[in-house]
Every structure is written in structure tokens, then in C-alpha cells.
Amino acid sequence: MITQEEQQKIIDRFGNGPNDTGTPEVQIAIFTKRIEHLTEHLEDHPNDNSTRQGLLDLVGKRRRLLNYLQENEIERYRTIRDELELRK
């Protein structure tokens, strides 16, 4: 799980204000940080299937948000993809 400080740094970097957690960019960045954390956990615990399922759920949620941005706000999509170094 990410700490409050990490989450606040993400909000400050990608959000429109200090309490902006609703924009797709902030949500994608938070999901990405959680995905990175769960990926590290699964490297140490490869048989933890409930965590693996949670990871797949997060990847799906992030993908849906990325698809939304790609369809409606292509420049914002390209910016967040490049900043987070996500594959296409």
C-alpha cells in the first residue's frame, strides 16, 4: 500500500489542486504506484493468488482510464503515458 505522503506527492504532481483525487491523471498515477508495489510483492510471494487478482483488477481499472483519456483527451493521454513511462 502506498503511504499518505506518496499519495500526496502524486496529487501535487498530477492534480489541479491539493485535494484533487478525481482527475484521470491522478487516478492513473496512483494506480501505477500501487501496481508497482504489488508487482514487487508478487516477486517475493509468487503463490499469493489473491494479490495477483487484485493486481489484475488494478491494471484493468488503469487501462479503462487510459482508454477514456485516449478517446476523449488525446493530449492528456500522451502526457500521462510519457510521464509515467507506460507502454502504449
Swiss-Prot record:
SMART domains: Ribosomal_S15
Protein name: Small ribosomal subunit protein uS15
Compositional bias annotation for Basic and acidic residues: 1-12
Region feature (Disordered): 1-24
Gene Ontology MF, one: rRNA binding
Job of this protein: One of the primary rRNA binding proteins, it binds directly to 16S rRNA where it helps nucleate assembly of the platform of the 30S subunit by binding and bridging several RNA helices of the 16S rRNA.
Keywords: Ribonucleoprotein, Ribosomal protein, RNA-binding, rRNA-binding
Pfam families found in the cross-reference section: Ribosomal_S15
PANTHER family reported in the protein's UniProt record: RIBOSOMAL PROTEIN S15, BACTERIAL AND ORGANELLAR, SMALL RIBOSOMAL SUBUNIT PROTEIN US15M
Domain of life: Bacteria
Taxon lineage: Bacteria, Pseudomonadati, Rhodothermota, Rhodothermia, Rhodothermales
Complex and partners: Part of the 30S ribosomal subunit. Forms a bridge to the 50S subunit in the 70S ribosome, contacting the 23S rRNA.
Native source organism of the sequence: Salinibacter ruber (strain DSM 13855 / M31)
GO terms of biological process kind: translation
Gene Ontology CC: cytosolic small ribosomal subunit
Family under the similarity heading: Belongs to the universal ribosomal protein uS15 family.
Signal peptide start-end: none
Keyword rRNA-binding assigned: yes
